[in-house]
Amino acid sequence: MNTSHKTLKTIAILGQPNVGKSSLFNRLARERIAITSDFAGTTRDINKRKIALNGHEVELLDTGGMAKDALLSKEIKALNLKAAQMSDLILYVVDGKSIPSDEDLKLFREVFKTNPNCFLVINKIDNDKEKERAYAFSSFGMPKSFNISVSHNRGISTLIDAILSALDLNQIIEQDLDADILESLENNAPKEEIKEEEIIQVGIIGRVNVGKSSLLNALTKKERSLVSSVAGTTIDPIDETILIGDQKICFVDTAGIRHRGKILGIEKYALERTQKALEKSHIALLVLDVSAPFVELDEKISSLADKHSLGIILILNKWDIRYAPYEEIMATLKRKFRFLEYAPIITTSCLKTHHIDEIKHKIIEVYECFSKRIPTSLLNSVINQATQKHPLPSDGGKLVKVYYATQFATKPPQISLIMNRPKALHFSYKRYLINTLRKEFNFLGTPLILNAKDKKSAQQN
C-alpha cells in the first residue's frame, strides 16, 4: 500500500553550532547520517530523514547552526525559521556545559515566537553532578526542558516519550500503521542498531611509549596502530572493534601524554582528542610501564579515568623486564594509586601477548559491574543493615537517619540516600557505606557514586 497519503509529524532540531544537534539527530535516527565534528557549524544544509520513534514514523530535520557570525548566517537563519514554522515540534538544543549568552536567549525567543511548540533540550549533562548547570537556562522560561547527554545516552528515552506525547502519537497502536510502513521501517533499519548501545567503549590511556599501541595490536591481532620505539607516534585516537562471543568491544588507543607543563600545537590537539575519546568511553585501560619506577605523571593520568567516572583496569606492561620484585611493585601500586583500590590488575608483556585473553574477559566483567542495577528492596536491605551495625553519627545532638536508598543511574552506578539531614553525612561514613555496597554486590573496577538528598530534592528530581 502506498503511504504518500499519510502526513508525517515533523520534528526540527535547531540551535547554535556545536551544541550537539547532529549528534542528537544521529541518536534519534539510530544511524550516523549527519557529519559531527568538534568544529562549530559543520551542518550547513538541512538533513531530512524518516525515522521510527518507538514504532511511530516521523520526519526529522537537522538544521545548520544559527550563530550570528556563522558563514551564510542570514540564509541559514531564514531556512531554520522556515523549518521551525513548518514543523509540528521543535527541539531547541543548547550546550549544558556553557553559560547561556544573550545571543542564545535572543535566538531561542525568535524560534519560540515562530512556533511555540518547542522543547528546550539541554545537552552535555553527562552525569547527575552536572544537573546544576541546567539551572542556568531557567531564564529561557520553558516549562518543557530536558536534560540529556547524547554521548552518554542519558535522558534520551524520556525525551522520546515526551516527543510522542506532544505529537499525540502515544495512543496510536501499532496495528493502525500500514503493513508496508512497518515492513519498510524494519527493512531499512541498520542491522547493528539493536546492539548499538551494547558496544563496550574502551579507552587505552597512559604516558608516551608505555605500550598502548602494542596493547591495541595484541588485543585486535592487527598492526593497526603504528608501533615504534620513538615516543609519541600515535597522535589521533585510533579505534578498532573486536568481537568476543556476541559482545562487541571498541578500543580507542589515545595519544600518549607527556611531561607536565605548557602543551602547544599538535600535543595540545592530541591531549584534547584524548579527553574527547574518554568522554565517550565506558572503561579505561590504564597502561603502566613497570620496566622502571612509576612517576607522578602516571598518577595524574589515572585521575582522568576518575574525572570521567569510568570503569578502570590497571595494565602492568613490560612485566617480563620489571624493575623490582612482585611484592615491591604491588606495594608501590597500592600506595600511589590508593583511590583505585577497586581496580583489577593484570600483568602483561604486550609485545609477547601475555595474558591478552585475560584482559578481554576482564573488560566484559568490569562492564557488567559498570552497568549493574541493584533491586531497590535489596539495596535498602543492605543499607538498613549497615546503618544498624554502625549507626549514623548525630548532627549536633540531632538524629540523622536514612529514609530510603534508590539507584537512579548506571554506567557508572549512582545511588541516592534520601535523608532527613543530608548535609550531615560525613565523608568517612559515606566511604563506609560504599565499601559495604562493594563487598555485597561486587562493583569490580567500577566507580560507585553515592550522594545524599532530602525528600524535597528527591521529589523534584
Curated annotation (Swiss-Prot):
Residues 372-456 form the KH-like domain. Associates with the 50S ribosomal subunit. Belongs to the TRAFAC class TrmE-Era-EngA-EngB-Septin-like GTPase superfamily. EngA (Der) GTPase family. Residues 9-171, 200-371 form the EngA-type G domain. GTP 1 binds at residues 15-22, 62-66, 123-126. One of its GO terms (biological process) is ribosome biogenesis. InterPro entries: G_ENGA, GTP-bd, GTPase_Der, KH_dom-like, KH_dom-like_a/b, P-loop_NTPase, Small_GTP-bd. PROSITE patterns: G_ENGA (PS51712). GTP 2 binds at residues 206-213, 253-257, 317-320. This is GTPase Der. The keyword Nucleotide-binding applies. It comes from the Bacteria. GO terms for molecular function: GTP binding; ribosome binding. GTPase that plays an essential role in the late steps of ribosome biogenesis. SUPFAM superfamilies: P-loop containing nucleoside triphosphate hydrolases (SSF52540). Keywords: GTP-binding, Nucleotide-binding, Repeat, Ribosome biogenesis.
